[in-house]
Amino acid sequence: MIEIVKLREHGELSSIAAEWFHQKWGIPVEAYAESIEECINNKKSVPQWYLVMENDAILGGLGVIENDFHNRKDLTPNICAVYVEEEYRCQGIAGKMLNFVCMDMKEKGIDTLYLVTDHTSFYERYNWKLLCMVQGDGEPDMTRIYIHKEM
């Protein structure tokens, strides 16, 4: 059975999750480990990390952090590191994950989330709206930032 797991409630998965996100995005494993540990130990609303799991296999995941490496520090918090394993794509997993996280964050008192991406037409399916262009840290080109407000 496929389930969405809140890493805050499953600290035993922190090392595996940090390594998985590192393998998908190439950001140092220590950065993920530190953010996931903060999620588990700090009890603040941000950061948060989530995995989609089937038995012991990670099918996908994402995080919620203050800023996903862009110049608009006022647009916070940001969904980051959205990834679904290739063989599990086109099955609605990303949409379920996004909806779950938006609802979970609303329960924590956060109804507006932002997401930086160069994808077009994917996030719109899940009620995300293009807000503006932002400058990524160290990036030569501007990229899109989307907004989602949970009603």
Model regions: which residues?
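Conserved active-site alpha-helix within GNAT-family acetyltransferase domains
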Residues: 107, 111, 117-141
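Short hydrophobic/aromatic beta-strand or adjacent loop that forms the aromatic wall/cage
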Residues: 47, 140-146
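Conserved beta-strand in the GNAT
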Residues: 51, 57-67, 78, 83
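Conserved acetyl-CoA-binding loop-helix of GNAT-fold acetyltransferases
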Residues: 84, 90-103
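Active-site beta-strand termini and strand-to-loop segments that position acidic
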Residues: 53-55, 148-149
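Active-site rim helix/loop that mediates acceptor-substrate recognition in acyltransferases
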Residues: 26-53
